[in-house]
Amino acid sequence: MTRKLVLLRHGQSQWNSMNRFTGWVDIGLTEQGHQEATMAGHLMKEEGLEFDVAHTSLLKRAIHTLQDALKALDQDWLPIYKSWRLNERHYGALQGLDKIDTAAKHGEEQVNIWRRSYDIQPPPIDLDDPSHPMRDRRYAALDRKVLPVTESLKNTLERVLPYWNDAIAPQLNDNKTVLISAHGNSLRALYKYLNQESDEKILNVNIPTGIPLLFELSDTLQVVSYRYLGDPDAAQRASEMVANQGKAK
């Protein structure tokens, strides 16, 4: 009997709509983002998914997406676990910048490397930057040394994996059906881990907002199959839109 896991990237955020790097900045959803989250819930309901537990990050765009989706699923009562380890990749000094302007300044190739490569970090924020996570009380209990000032996808995976191993994998091993509402890069990190994707191939993996990605896993949590729910052509188009966000006009 397979275990079921759904990865759901948050719906469109206000900075997604403005094509800005977001990272750990706590930006809310647009109205379209709320609609995407609700539609995701309907797609999961049509699939007949009955979850036992849900996980999300400490950022409201993922939290609100989960709330909207669970409401549409009529599964609002589910236990929800939140962890900073599911936060988006920290984009360092790129956070808040327009992606097209950044591509025009640094070149599309460089921006694509920053956005989609596995082990290359963007420039870091300074320690005295007002947006440094150490100034945010939601991270007050954490050792300052673990708070990022920039991250590559590799760093993000290293951050996410302990939570997978300690919290999520044991639930799947207990035959629980699990929903994770998180972010483009924290989910890309999990996608890479689950599919044993190469460092090169992950460059071309783009996860669209608000479309549930259903994994079926074996009893050893190996991938049996995975697919986006709903129209596969719509998911492909949405993935291509994500890929094009860092291109200069």
From Swiss-Prot:
Pathway: Carbohydrate degradation; glycolysis; pyruvate from D-glyceraldehyde 3-phosphate: step 3/5. Substrate binds at residues 9-16, 22-23, 61, 88-91, 99, 115-116, 184-185. It holds the Pfam family His_Phos_1. The active site is at residues 10, 88. CDD domains: HP_PGM_like (cd07067). One of its GO terms (molecular function) is phosphoglycerate mutase activity. Gene3D superfamilies: Phosphoglycerate mutase-like (3.40.50.1240). InterPro entries: His_Pase_superF_clade-1, His_PPase_superfam, PG/BPGM_mutase_AS, Phosphogly_mut1. The record marks 183 as: Transition state stabilizer. It catalyses: (2R)-2-phosphoglycerate = (2R)-3-phosphoglycerate. It is an enzyme of class 5 (isomerase). Catalyzes the interconversion of 2-phosphoglycerate and 3-phosphoglycerate. Homodimer. This is 2,3-bisphosphoglycerate-dependent phosphoglycerate mutase.
